[in-house]
Amino acid sequence: MKKRTLLLFIVVFAFNQSSIYAQNTDVFSPKYIKETMVKVTDWQMKNQIHKETDWTNGAFFAGVFAAYETTKSPRIMDSLMAMGERNLWLPHPRFDHADDIAISQTYIDLYRIKKDRRMIQATIDSVLKMRKIKGNEEKKHGIAWWWCDALFMAPPTLAKLAVTLKDPSFFVQNDSLYKQCYDLLYNKEEHLFARDAKYLWNVQGEGKKEANGKKLFWSRGNGWVMGGLVKLLKEMPKNYPTRSFYVTLYKEMAARLLSLQQADGLWRASLLDPASYPGGEGSGSGFDCYAMAWGINNGILNKATYLPAVQKTWKALNSLITPAGKVGWVQPIGADPRRNFNSESFEVYGAGAFLLAGSEVIKLKK
């Protein structure tokens, strides 16, 4: 008990120390948001720790492109183009693994500006190959998108291809793969996703549990889904036949996540047992902020209900950033809640989540 009390004190003290940076700043001013997005982009660009086409950077560069759209910084555009050229505009090598086309979201966004087909051809080839050949993921797991993170990594790429190429078959392909993942992992009582089949309970009520006996639902995993839903819905035509399915899912999850937000504005690594995981987590909270702000901006979420929550989260997220631009309190790569991060913990996807959030928060009307 003493150890746990000491841990909680250390977490709260460290959080308060890092909060000093944002306490006396208007974090909602467009000038501040743009400057902070550039600062976060610059710091993370200089502190890369993964291959640029890795899924981690797929999430980061999605945020960097959002930073470009927000700031119109030529330097950010130059950095994005240089990244694509260095990697020959190739996705990661596994054609049937959702992670490996996460980077393609950014390739397609850049293609829409530059109109150079070679920027997206390898992505098109990879996605079409899935229609012809059963890949290793489906052979091993029964479905290709067998973990909830996949719903951020791949659906936006398929949706962007559908719109860019004016080919709805990519939406159809997404619908099939998405529904398989949804049917396997979505809990219709909790309105949350299990990370993968290992975290499902059987009919006898047996399975992985938190210390309080509740089911294990991972904050970042559900943040991935929310962020992916937004990026999918941004592309999908209003009259697309299955759009209502995605909107309903988005609203269900938004309402549930709103009820699980903690007093400081952040979500804990474990959604249903926050007391066991002191200290807010930056990446899941960033994706949730992005998703809810977008919903307000597009009239899908009730402003009176969700705006206070988004404002609270945005303030809290800014308290996680060092003066140099590092986004701290980000849980390392994993698949479930852990107590393995602190103010010094960063990951590229944490920066990406913050940048995506900033791109929508700046559009909010108070």
Give names to the regions the model predicted.
Residues 23-58, 66-86, 90-104, 110-129, ...:
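CBM-like carbohydrate-recognition segments
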Residues 32-37, 78-80, 125, 129-136, ...:
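Acidic-glycine-rich active-site phosphate/pyrophosphate-binding loop
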Residues 36, 86, 90, 136, ...:
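Surface loop/turn signatures of beta-propeller and other carbohydrate-active proteins
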Residues 60-63, 103-106, 150, 154-157:
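The tetratricopeptide repeat
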Residues 115, 122, 142-153, 166-173, ...:
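Short, well-structured alpha-helical patches and their helix-loop capping segments
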Residues 120-158:
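Asp-box/WD-like beta-propeller blade repeats and closely related beta-sheet repeat scaffolds
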Residues 148-149, 159-271, 278-289, 301-330, ...:
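Extended ligand-binding clefts on enzyme/binding-domain cores
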